Every structure is written in structure tokens, then in C-alpha cells.
């Protein structure tokens, strides 16, 4: 039976932890120059309605390193951009490729694509979730902190797809998470409610320094996500003070690490000084998109 990677809570804790183990193994093999062609002869179709640097490069390179091939398709270059129903696209693509990664706006659209496809679907990002990124983040924490489930995590900024994904992660892995957002910019209510039912240890605040106090991991994202450019000025005013900077770091654990999914708007949600500090592991984090996604693709498509 085919399996998809749409949202963390669709998978079991054991399955998610197996991805970390496989990613670490594939990363070690890549660093050692050992071939690991687990997807030889396989093709990944990559559907993009949102532009990207890290998502496209990491999936394309990942398929190459796994011995397969990746096919880039933008919405403007396919019939989806002209109104072809998702259920038709899913069934047609299922006859051509062995898996689909989609980066788009609507989570419902991704779930519909998965419903009608007979091949694995990977959520490369929606406005609701970014599961590949949060798994890369946690792989990075594991590399730097080891006992990642015993740490306190802090999210500062917008209650966006990354915040939603971190709440899902807290529900699945059981760690403590504090989410600090301005009033009116909280995470999605359905995500909050589901995490509560799953027993997640998540605290929601409007004070970033209180959220950061003693935290082992500080994390943030841009104040205005793709598609929200017209709200930039309004959001800049609302998010003033919700920044990772020297004061935030001083409030956290002395050995804290800083995460950011990138691209960063330096001196907005995070200062240039902070992102260049010894606490920041953002480029390890960016690299780990490659390794965790290879593990996801190998698990679903091998």
C-alpha cells in the first residue's frame, strides 16, 4: 500500500525516528563517497506553484545521489496552471513517475493529489505545513544536542506553516515547546486543538523573552511569508520586538542553538549578529534538508 508524507501526525513516532536514523546513515555514506543508489531507475516529479531555492535543489540533488532522476515542473508549464483538475493530474502523473513532491499553497490540494495518485506524494511546503523542514531542523538538533526529546524549544514570530509544523512535532516527539507570537498572528486553531488532544506540551505566549527563557533551541521565520508581500509594512509593525537578537539569546540557555529555515530577512526576524553567531546552526540545518528528504524519498519510493 502506498504511503505519503503530507503531515507529521500522519506517521507514527517509530516511523519518524526511523527517518532520522536513515538520514544519518545516508549522510555518512555521502560524506564518505559511498554510493547509495536506493532509487536507481526511479523518477521524482517535482510540482512547484511556489518558487524555491532549497526545496528544488535539495530534492533534485537528493534524487541524483540516490541514483534516480528528478523532473522539475512549474505550474505555468503544466496543465494545472490552466485549470486541469488535481484528480486528473494525479492519475496521469502516476503513470509516468514514481513519486511526486509538491510545493504549493493549499494543504487541501496536496491531500486531494494524494487521494487520487497511486504513487507517494511528498509535501514540499504548503501554507499550512512544512514537514520536511521541521524534520531537517530536528535532525540538526540531534546532531548538536543528542537528547532532542528532553529539550525546551522556543518559536518566536509568525504562527505560520513552520509554527504549525513545530506544534505537530511537539505532539509527536513529546518535547516542550513555547510559541511566542503577536496577538492576531497565532498558529492555526485546528493545529492547536489537535495537538492538545494528542497531549502536546505547548505553551502559547505573546512575550518573546518569556518564551526564550532557558530554552535550548530558538527558532524563527520571516514575518511575511510568500504571498503576503502586501502585508509587509503592517506585519513589520506588529512583529516589532519578536526578533532573535542578543537579548533573546541572553535569556535562553547559554548553550542554545539558533534555527531558521531560510531565507532570512536579516535585522528583521533575526539580527545579522545572531545569525552569524556561534549559536546559529542554520547552514547545517539547510544541508540537512538534503539528507532527511533523501531518507523520506528512499522510505517511500524504494
From Swiss-Prot:
One term under GO cellular component: cytoplasm
Catalytic activity from the UniProt record: carbamoyl phosphate + L-ornithine = L-citrulline + phosphate + H(+)
EC number: 2.1.3.3
GO molecular function, one term: ornithine carbamoyltransferase activity
Entry keywords, A to Z: Amino-acid biosynthesis, Arginine biosynthesis, Cytoplasm, Transferase
Metal-binding in keyword set: no
SUPFAM superfamilies, A to Z: Aspartate/ornithine carbamoyltransferase
Family: Belongs to the aspartate/ornithine carbamoyltransferase superfamily. OTCase family.
PANTHER family reported in the protein's UniProt record: ORNITHINE CARBAMOYLTRANSFERASE, MITOCHONDRIAL, ORNITHINE TRANSCARBAMYLASE, MITOCHONDRIAL
Role, per record: Reversibly catalyzes the transfer of the carbamoyl group from carbamoyl phosphate (CP) to the N(epsilon) atom of ornithine (ORN) to produce L-citrulline.
Protein name: Ornithine carbamoyltransferase
The organism of origin for this protein: Syntrophotalea carbinolica (strain DSM 2380 / NBRC 103641 / GraBd1) (Pelobacter carbinolicus)
Amino acid at each position: 500500500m502506498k504511503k505519503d508524507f503530507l503531515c507529521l501526525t500522519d506517521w507514527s513516532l517509530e516511523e519518524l525516528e526511523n527517518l532520522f536514523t536513515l538520514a544519518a546513515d545516508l549522510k555518512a555514506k555521502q560524506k564518505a563517497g559511498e554510493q547509495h543508489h536506493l532509487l536507481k531507475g526511479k523518477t521524482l516529479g517535482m510540482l512547484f506553484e511556489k518558487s524555491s531555492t532549497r526545496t528544488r535543489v535539495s530534492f533534485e540533488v537528493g534524487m541524483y545521489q540516490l541514483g534516480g532522476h528528478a523532473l522539475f515542473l512549474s505550474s505555468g508549464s503544466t496543465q494545472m496552471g490552466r485549470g486541469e483538475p488535481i484528480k486528473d493530474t494525479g492519475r496521469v502523473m502516476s503513470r509516468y513517475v514514481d513519486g511526486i513532491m509538491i510545493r504549493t499553497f493549499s494543504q487541501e490540494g496536496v491531500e486531494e493529489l494524494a487521494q487520487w495518485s497511486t504513487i507517494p506524494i511528498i509535501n514540499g511546503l504548503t501554507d499550512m505545513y512544512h514537514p520536511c523542514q521541521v524534520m531537517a531542523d530536528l535532525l540538526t538538533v540531534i546532531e548538536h544536542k543528542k537528547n532532542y526529546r528532553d529539550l525546551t524549544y522556543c518559536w518566536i514570530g509568525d504562527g505560520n506553516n513552520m509554527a504549525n509544523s513545530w506544534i505537530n512535532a511537539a505532539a509527536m516527539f513529546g518535547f516542550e515547546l513555547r510559541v511566542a507570537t503577536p496577538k492576531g498572528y497565532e498558529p492555526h486553531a485546528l493545529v492547536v486543538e489537535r495537538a492538545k488532544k494528542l497531549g502536546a506540551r505547548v505553551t502559547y505566549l505573546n512575550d518573546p523573552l518569556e518564551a526564550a527563557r532557558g530554552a535550548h533551541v530558538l527558532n524563527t521565520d520571516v514575518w511575511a511569508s510568500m504571498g503576503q508581500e502586501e502585508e509587509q509594512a503592517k506585519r513589520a509593525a506588529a512583529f516589532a520586538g519578536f526578533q532573535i537578537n542578543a537579548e533573546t539569546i541572553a535569556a535562553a540557555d547559554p548553550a542554545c542553538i539558533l534555527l531558521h529555515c531560510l531565507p532570512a530577512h536579516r535585522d528583521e526576524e533575526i539580527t545579522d549578529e545572531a545569525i552569524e553567531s556561534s549559536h546559529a546552526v542554520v547552514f547545517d540545518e539547510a544541508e540537512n534538508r538534503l539528507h532527511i528528504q533523501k531518507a523520506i524519498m528512499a522510505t517511500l519510493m524504494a
